[in-house]
Amino acid sequence: MGDNKNNGDSGKLLYCSFCGKSQHEVRKLIAGPSVYVCDECVELCNDIIREEIKEISPKRDSDKLPTPHELRAHLDDYVIGQDRAKKVLSVAVYNHYKRLKNSSPKDGVELGKSNILLIGPTGSGKTLLAETLARSLNVPFTMADATTLTEAGYVGEDVENIIQKLLQKCDYDVEKAQRGIVYIDEIDKISRKSDNPSITRDVSGEGVQQALLKLIEGTVAAVPPQGGRKHPQQEFLQVDTSKILFICGGAFAGLEKVIEQRAHVGSGIGFGAQVKGEKDKATISETLSQVEPGDLVKYGLIPEFIGRLPVVATLTELDEEALVQILSQPKNALTKQYSALFEMEGVELEFREDALKAIAHKAMSRKTGARGLRSIVESILLDTMYDIPSVDGVVKAVVDESVVNGESAPILIYEHNETQAASGEQ
C-alpha cells in the first residue's frame, strides 16, 4: 500500500473510493489493491471510532447507580450540616436517574420528572450540594445565574444558552449532556414584584420564568454545534431536556415573613404582639421549612414555574460551630487546601483552634456564611505566601487568634529554631 499523488503509469485521474474526490482535491490519496482512500476520509473514520469509544466508556461507568445512602455519605464528606436537605436531594436525584435507567414505562406508568428547588441563605451550601452530587454521579454539571437571563430577543443571555454551556462541558456529546445536572442560582431574583400579573413587559423577571418553563419541564432544544458560526451549514444539535435534572436555588430573603403572614405567627397587636429578639433568629430556618407553593406564588414566582419544581428542600443558616467544622473537616476543607499550598514550598501550615473560631466569628459578623471564609483566610495568609518562596529555612507557619484579629503576623518556625525547641523540651 502506498500514497499516490500522480496520475500513475496509466495517466488516469485517480479518485477516492469513499467520497469520490479526485487526487487534485485532496492532500493525500492512499492506494490499496484497486482501492483509493483520501486523507479526509481517513480523518473522518478516526473521528467515528473515537466517538464510539467515548460512548462505550460512560455506559460502563454509569451501570451502577449509587443508592440514596451512598449519595448522602458522599455529600457528608464535602458538606457540613444540612441533614434534611441532603436526604431530600439524595432521594430526588436517585429517583431521577432511576427513571432514566428504566425509560420504558412499566404497565403504561410513565414516571414524571422531579426538578428541585433549594431555599436557603447565602453561603449555606446550595451550590456545593449540587456540584458534589454531579461529581459523585460522574455526570456533566453547569451553573447559570438567573439574573443574567432575559427573554429571547432582548439584550442578555437566552435560556437556551444554559444547554449550550452544558454541551460545552461534555465536548458536545448530546447523550452525555442529557444525563447532566443544571444548577440555576439566584432564582428568587426573577420573581415579579407582586403576585398580580403585570401589564408591563418584564423581560428579566416573569418573562424569564415563562421562558424557563418548557426548558425545565422537558423540550427538544435546538443548539448550534461547536463552531456553529464557522460552519453555518451544519445542522443544529437536538437536546432532550426532559432527561436533564434542573436544580434551582435562591436565598428568598423575606420569604419567612410571607409564611408567617399565612400561618398568623407573630401577627398580634399591642400586648398580644410577639417581639422577636436575638434568640429568635434561628426560627427563620424553622419557618422556611414550612414553605408551601402558595407562599412562593405570593413571593413572586408564577404557579406554572413552581409546578415544574415539585421537590423543595430548605437549608438552615450556618452557625459559628458549623463554620469551624467547614474550615477543617470536609475532604476539601479550606485549611487542607492552604496546607497543600504551603507543602509545595516545603512548609507545614498549622491553624490553632482559637484561630478557626476567630475566622468563623468574623464570617458570621459579615453575614456571608461559608462563602466568606476563603477571603478571610486569603487575607490572613497573603503576606506569608508572598514572603515564604523567597525565605530559606522556614519549616512551619502557625496561625492563631491574634493573627486573625490583625494583631500579629503568622509565627514562622525555622529549621534551627525547631531543633532548639525540641532540645529545650527534653
Swiss-Prot record:
Residues bound to ATP are: P121, T122, G123, S124, G125, K126, T127, L128
Q: Where is the ClpX-type ZB domain?
A: 4-57
The residues listed in the UniProt record as binding Zn(2+), with positions renumbered to this chain, are: C16, C19, C38, C41
Q: Which Pfam families does this entry report, sorted A to Z?
A: AAA_2, ClpB_D2-small, zf-C4_ClpX
* Keywords for this protein: ATP-binding, Chaperone, Metal-binding, Nucleotide-binding, Zinc
One GO MF term on file is: ATP-dependent protein folding chaperone
Q: Give the GO cellular component terms, alphabetically.
A: HslUV protease complex
Q: Which GO terms describe its biological process?
A: cell division; proteolysis involved in protein catabolic process
**Family (UniProt):** Belongs to the ClpX chaperone family.
Q: What's its job?
A: ATP-dependent specificity component of the Clp protease. It directs the protease to specific substrates. Can perform chaperone functions in the absence of ClpP.
Subunit structure comment from the entry? Component of the ClpX-ClpP complex. Forms a hexameric ring that, in the presence of ATP, binds to fourteen ClpP subunits assembled into a disk-like structure with a central cavity, resembling the structure of eukaryotic proteasomes.
What PANTHER family does this protein map onto? ATP-DEPENDENT CLP PROTEASE ATP-BINDING SUBUNIT CLPX-LIKE, MITOCHONDRIAL, ATP-DEPENDENT CLP PROTEASE ATP-BINDING SUBUNIT CLPX-LIKE, MITOCHONDRIAL-RELATED
Protein name (database record): ATP-dependent Clp protease ATP-binding subunit ClpX
Source organism (scientific name): Shewanella sp. (strain W3-18-1)
Q: What are the leading ranks of the lineage?
A: Bacteria, Pseudomonadati, Pseudomonadota, Gammaproteobacteria, Alteromonadales
